[in-house]
Regions:
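A composition-biased, non-transmembrane "mature-region" signal
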Residues: 1-170
């Protein structure tokens, strides 16, 4: 592993590990799905990638005094399998949307990210739920390593190289 591998997020398989077929690699990545995992890995259906791992971190709505508000936050890892190079190119994407509608205001905030990201975050909020009961409306804990490390391990264990993409084509 070279210096630039560390900086770029490239993970190479151990020497002597033979690369499996793309079908076997895809099956190994999809096998990471489990009921207890906070994320889901699926085949990409829009053609922008081969596989996508998505963690829906927060999706909450609540009532405030004279208004309603909400927060939605998600993190995705899109992956493209390059059979010729036995390489998986991956890009991290996240988005956050928060909104508030009340008297006399209407407010919307949205942000997004594309590249390579390492994040640890957490949050909680108490308010009136949509059932008009006071309590916790969201509580989340997020660590991007929990989704990326198993993916990288599955790729390198099967003889392929993991390459993080920040600016280039996936």
């Amino acid at each position: 592993m070279g210096l630039f591998d560390f900086l770029s997020g490239r993970k190479r398989p151990k020497s002597g590990v033979v690369a499996v077929s793309s079908d076997k690699l895809e099956a190994a990545i999809l096998a990471l799905n489990r009921d207890t995992a906070p994320y889901q890995i699926t085949k990409c259906d829009d053609g922008s990638c081969d596989l996508v791992a998505e963690w829906k971190i927060v999706d909450a709505k609540w009532y405030e005094i004279f208004g309603k508000a909400g927060l939605k936050k998600a993190f995705k890892v899109k992956m493209r399998l390059d059979v010729e190079k036995s390489e998986v190119r991956a890009v991290d994407m996240d988005y956050t949307v928060s909104w508030r509608a009340g008297v006399p205001e209407l407010e919307l905030h949205a942000s997004g990210f594309r590249g390579q990201k390492s994040e640890i975050s957490f949050g909680t909020a108490y308010a009136f739920s949509e059932e008009l009961e006071f309590g916790q409306v969201y509580n989340y804990r997020f660590n991007s390593a929990e989704i990326k490390k198993p993916l990288q391990q599955a790729v390198t264990d099967n003889g392929w190289t993991w390459r993080g993409v920040a600016f280039g084509k996936l």
